[in-house]
A protein has these predicted regions:
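Basic polycationic patches enriched in arginine
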Residues: 8-11
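A short, small-residue-rich loop immediately preceding and capping a beta-strand
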Residues: 123-144, 156-159
Length: 470
C-alpha cells in the first residue's frame, strides 16, 4: 500500500464533554483535601496501597439484552486480573449496548454516540489513567474506539467474541439462516416445524453473529487498526482462551501506560486505511463505512467515504466468509484467525506494515512469525484466485446518491440493470410484501427514510434481503 497517508492524529482535536482529565495524584495520603474521596474508596474495599496505583477503567457493554453482550462480565474479570498483575487498580463500569439486529431504528446509531459520550464522562469524572473496553456488537465496538480516540489515554479494545454456529440437517447455520427461513416459510418451501427447528438451533452459544456481520467486522477493524491485542478478535465467545486474551489486555494497557503510548499515536491515516482494507479483504459489513469516519473524526483525521472506496477498490478479497461466502468466524479462527488473514493481506501489499499497535510493535513485527496455513479454503493468498469470492463492497456515486452510497453484492460484470422499483417507507412494509410473496423476479426493493435522520438511527434492513434470499 502507499506510504503517504500516515498523518498522526492530533491530541488537541476531537470533541469533548469537559476539560482535561483530573489527576489521580489528588488521592495521595498526603492530600488532606482528598480525605473524603479516599473515604469513599475505602467503603469499596480499596487499601491505601491500591489508591496509590494507577486507576484503570474497565468498561463493558454487558447486559442481558443480547447474546453478544452476555459474556462480557466474565471476560472483564480476567482483564482486571491483568491490570492488578501489572501494578494497576482496575475500576469496572458498564455502559449501554443494544444489538444491531435486535433494536428499533431509533436506537442503533444513536446508541453509538451515547456510549462514546458516557465513557468519556465517566473516565474524566473519575480521573482514570487508562482504559480497557469490552464490547459485543459493531456499534459498541465503534463507540468505544471513538471514546478512546477522544480521551487519548492509553487504551485497549477487546471484542467479546463470536457465537458458535448451530447445526441443522448436518450443516452449520447462523442467525442469517433464520432470516432466510422466514422468507422460505413465506414462499411455502419449508413448514412451521422446519422454521421452529431452525430458530431453536441457530444460536447455541453466547457471542455475536457467527459470520462476518457487523460485530465481527468491527472486531477485525479493532485488530487491524492497532487497538486490540493481536489474535483476540476472532476467538469465539465460549472458548476459555478468551480469558487469556482478556488477561493479556489488562497487562497490555499497563505497558502502554508505562510507555505513554496513546490511541492517537496508533490511529494514523494509514491505520484507518488498514482498517478499511480488512473490511474488504474479509468480505465484511458495510457498517464500517459509517463507523470509520466517526472514529477518524475523533482524531482530527478526514477519512471519508471516498477514501474508504479507494481502499476497497484496491484490496483483494482474501477470506471466504459468510454472509457472502462459505465459512464462519469459527472456521477463520481454526485457520489462524485474524493474524493469518492480516499476514495474507501483508503479503498481498494490502496493509501498511509500519503502523504502530498496542503491543508497542508494528503490524509487520507482530506478524513476523505468523504464517497463512495451507490445506483449507478459508483464507487465500492473492495469487490463488482470491478474486473468485463473490461478494464485494463498493462505494458508488451518482445522481441517486451525490454524496456516495455503499453497495454489497456480486462482482459487477455488467454496469447496467433494469428492473421495476418497489418503493417502501419502512422495513416492516417491505417485509409484509415478502411475507405474501407480492413481488416478481427482477423487482428492485427500495426502502426509503432509513438513514441517520429518516429512521432515525440508521436501521439495518438486512432482514429483508435475507428473507428474499430464502
Amino acid at each position: 500500500m502507499d506510504e503517504d497517508a500516515g498523518a498522526r492524529g492530533t491530541r488537541a482535536s476531537g470533541p469533548s464533554l469537559t476539560g482535561s482529565t483530573p489527576n489521580q495524584t489528588s488521592l495521595s495520603p498526603d492530600s488532606v483535601a482528598a480525605a473524603p474521596q479516599r473515604a469513599r474508596l475505602h467503603a469499596m474495599g480499596l487499601t491505601s496501597a491500591q489508591m496509590a496505583r494507577p486507576f484503570v477503567g474497565v468498561v463493558t457493554s454487558w447486559n442481558e439484552a443480547s447474546p453478544g453482550n452476555i459474556a462480557l462480565a466474565r471476560q472483564a474479570q480476567a482483564v482486571k486480573r491483568g491490570v492488578r498483575d501489572a501494578g494497576g487498580t482496575p475500576r469496572e463500569f458498564t455502559t449501554i449496548g443494544g444489538s444491531d439486529s435486535g433494536v428499533s431504528g431509533i436506537s442503533s446509531l444513536i446508541s453509538r454516540d451515547l456510549i462514546a459520550d458516557s465513557i468519556e464522562a465517566m473516565v474524566r469524572a473519575h480521573g482514570y489513567a487508562a482504559l480497557v473496553g469490552l464490547a459485543g456488537c459493531g456499534t459498541s465496538l465503534a463507540a468505544m474506539m471513538m471514546a478512546m480516540a477522544r480521551l487519548d489515554l492509553p487504551s485497549v479494545i477487546m471484542f467479546g467474541g463470536a457465537a458458535l454456529p448451530g447445526r441443522y440437517l448436518d450443516r452449520d447455520i447462523t442467525l442469517q439462516d433464520v432470516y432466510e427461513a422466514v422468507g422460505a416459510h413465506a414462499a411455502g418451501t419449508i413448514s412451521d416445524d422446519d422454521l421452529r427447528a431452525i430458530e431453536t438451533a441457530a444460536c447455541p452459544s453466547a457471542g455475536a453473529g457467527a459470520g462476518q456481520f457487523s460485530a465481527n467486522t468491527m472486531a477485525s477493524v479493532s485488530e487491524a487498526i492497532g487497538l486490540a491485542v493481536p489474535g483476540s478478535a476472532g476467538l469465539p465467545a465460549p472458548y476459555d482462551a478468551r480469558d487469556d486474551f482478556a488477561h493479556k489486555a489488562g497487562l497490555t494497557v499497563m505497558d502502554l501506560l508505562d510507555r505513554d503510548i496513546r490511541p492517537r499515536d496508533i490511529l494514523t491515516g494509514q491505520a484507518f486505511e488498514n482498517a478499511a482494507s480488512i473490511v474488504a479483504a474479509s468480505g465484511g459489513a458495510a457498517c464500517a463505512a459509517l463507523h470509520l469516519p466517526a472514529i477518524a473524526h475523533e482524531c482530527g483525521i478526514d477519512f471519508d467515504l471516498t477514501a474508504i472506496g479507494y481502499v476497497w477498490r484496491r484490496t483483494p478479497r482474501l477470506a471466504d466468509l459468510r454472509p457472502g461466502g462459505t465459512f464462519l468466524v469459527r472456521d477463520l479462527h481454526d485457520a489462524g484467525g485474524t493474524p493469518a488473514l492480516m499476514r495474507a493481506m501483508l503479503n498481498a501489499g494490502a496493509l501498511h506494515g509500519s503502523c504502530l499497535t498496542v503491543t508497542g510493535n508494528s503490524i509487520a513485527e507482530n506478524l513476523q512469525q505468523v504464517e497463512v496455513p495451507t490445506g483449507h479454503d478459508v483464507i487465500r493468498s492473492s495469487d490463488q484466485q482470491a478474486d473468485r469470492f463473490r461478494v464485494r463492497l463498493y462505494v458508488l456515486q451518482g445522481n441517486l446518491a451525490p454524496d456516495g452510497a455503499v453497495m454489497t453484492g456480486d462482482d459487477m460484470v455488467s454496469q447496467r440493470f433494469l428492473g421495476r422499483a418497489r418503493c417502501f417507507d419502512s422495513e416492516a412494509a417491505a417485509c409484509a410484501v415478502v411475507a405474501h410473496c407480492g413481488y416478481e423476479e427482477g423487482d428492485v426493493f427500495v426502502i426509503r427514510h432509513q438513514g441517520p435522520k429518516g429512521g432515525p438511527g440508521m436501521l439495518s434492513v438486512g432482514a429483508v434481503a435475507a428473507a428474499l434470499s430464502g
